[in-house]
């Protein structure tokens, strides 16, 4: 009898240990958790002006400033973690990051795997070409090589619209848009498709190299902040402070700092 009892106790202890290990596999942050635990924000740190490294190797940007103010109001420390943007959903689902906050388009496909904040900025995918290019229409891009970022809304659109993508000789995918623009400048590709805000900002820094066309790829979208499906509490708390920041003019001031005017969703 003692042997049976000991065996049962051993099995119970083993099950408890397994359950304990399983609960540690995913550590998600919640707004109501300990105030000393940082909220980890995943971003592409080569995505100016939303999030990027400055000359001092510090991560800065419009979204970074928004996140700093929001977490300050939540009385929580914040940690910005550079991630592979093409693996962003896995980073969020695993709990390695608590939030994706980096010019992320809200799409129906992404809603299947993430919770989103309310939209805070409008966006569209636009084609940029070399400054001396005569490309002005989609027809002129037929048989040309275009570049975009892996994991981007443009990539999703082209993957889901093969007839549209087939008109191009090749769609090259890059880890970040900076590499795509470098290839465009060096003549390795004919055009770059990117978020209009990001492309315009980059173009302003390289006015002698690139120009924006009127060619829009796909439908207009909105930027939103993404959270894990099971982290409704954090989503709601961040949304609450974002609403406060909009009402008191803080978001408008941050927009004016980075874009010269308030271009956020009213």
Report residues per predicted region.
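Extended ligand-binding regions for polar small-molecule ligands
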Residues: 22, 64-73, 135, 140, ...
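Bacterial lipoprotein signal-peptidase II cleavage site
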Residues: 17-32
């Amino acid at each position: 009898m003692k042997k049976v009892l000991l065996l049962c106790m051993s099995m119970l202890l083993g099950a408890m240990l397994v359950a304990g290990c399983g609960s540690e596999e995913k550590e998600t942050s919640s707004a109501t958790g300990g105030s000393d635990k940082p909220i980890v924000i995943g971003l592409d740190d080569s995505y100016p002006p939303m999030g990027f490294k400055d000359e001092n190797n510090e991560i800065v940007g419009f979204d970074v400033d928004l996140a700093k103010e929001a977490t300050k109001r939540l009385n929580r420390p914040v940690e910005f973690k550079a991630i592979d943007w093409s693996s962003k959903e896995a980073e969020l689902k695993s709990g390695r990051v608590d939030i994706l906050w980096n010019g992320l388009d809200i799409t129906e496909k992404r809603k299947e795997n993430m919770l989103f904040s309310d939209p805070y900025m409008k966006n569209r995918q636009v084609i940029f070409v070399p400054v001396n290019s005569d490309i002005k229409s989609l027809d002129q891009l037929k048989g040309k090589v275009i570049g975009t970022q892996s994991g981007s809304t443009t990539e999703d659109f082209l993957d889901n619209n093969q007839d549209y993508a087939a008109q191009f000789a090749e769609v090259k995918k890059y880890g970040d848009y900076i590499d795509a623009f470098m290839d465009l400048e060096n003549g390795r590709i004919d055009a770059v498709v990117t978020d209009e805000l990001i492309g315009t900002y980059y173009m302003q820094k390289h006015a002698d190299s690139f120009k924006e066309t009127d060619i829009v790829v796909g439908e207009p979208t909105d930027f939103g902040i993404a959270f894990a499906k099971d982290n409704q509490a954090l989503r709601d708390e961040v949304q609450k402070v974002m609403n406060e920041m909009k009402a008191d003019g803080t978001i408008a001031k941050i927009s004016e700092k980075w874009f010269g005017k308030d271009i956020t969703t009213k």
